[in-house]
Amino acid sequence: EYYLLAGGSHLQKDFGSTVNEIEKDGFQVYRNVDIEMSQDTLFATAKAIGTGILSLSKSLDELRPDFLVVYADRYESFAAMITGTQMNIPTVHIEGGDYTEGGALDDSVRHAMTKLAHLHFTTNQQSSNRILAMGEESWRVNTVGFPVIDLIAEKRYATSDEVVKKLSLDLTRPIILFTQHSVTTEFEDSFAQLKPSLDAIRELSGRGV
């Protein structure tokens, strides 16, 4: 038996209220956890972690679960990990030990969560090695792979025709796939850091791409 707690951006309209997608996939959400994140500032993030701890502690005190599963390294997850360990609930961390290029804040939060967690399920051996190097006992560290690979193996993804239709792609022209990870500690400069990439894409577009 599981109890699913949803919070953070899952509940925010600006991010698509993705809690609805969770329920649409057949998962019952036990409770929506209020983690206030009204602004994109350093103060708001710190406040959201505190709000998350307060909200999550009420739910976990009511549930008294055998263990708590926490995913990745977002601020909501950080709040959940702190709450679980402080309430003496065995915690399981998924995707610990990963490394983000550029010294992003993600690494500090992720590794802090690793030291709070009791069991670790990593996506690759290098991540497991980093956790072991932090002094975690080997029996606590399990290399299980990236969960999304299961969806790919089961072919649970949109077909190429569905992607073309949804994104209105013109297959007679080359396609550019672009992604850029912002430096989380330099969010005020994020547009200036992104602009050269946007200029490059604009230049390519001018050449008929």
Where are the model-predicted features located?
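Conserved nucleotide-sugar phosphate-binding/catalytic loop shared by glycosyltransferases and other
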Residues: 3-48, 55
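Charged helix-capping and loop-helix junction motifs
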Residues: 105-108, 159-160, 190-199
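A nucleotide-sugar donor-handling region in carbohydrate enzymes
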Residues: 11-16, 117-192
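Generic hydrophobic alpha-helical segments
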Residues: 52-59, 163, 197, 201
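A conserved nucleotide-sugar
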Residues: 199-209
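Active-site and donor-binding regions of nucleotide-sugar-utilizing enzymes
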Residues: 1, 36-138
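Structural beta-sheet core signal
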Residues: 3-6, 93, 143, 178
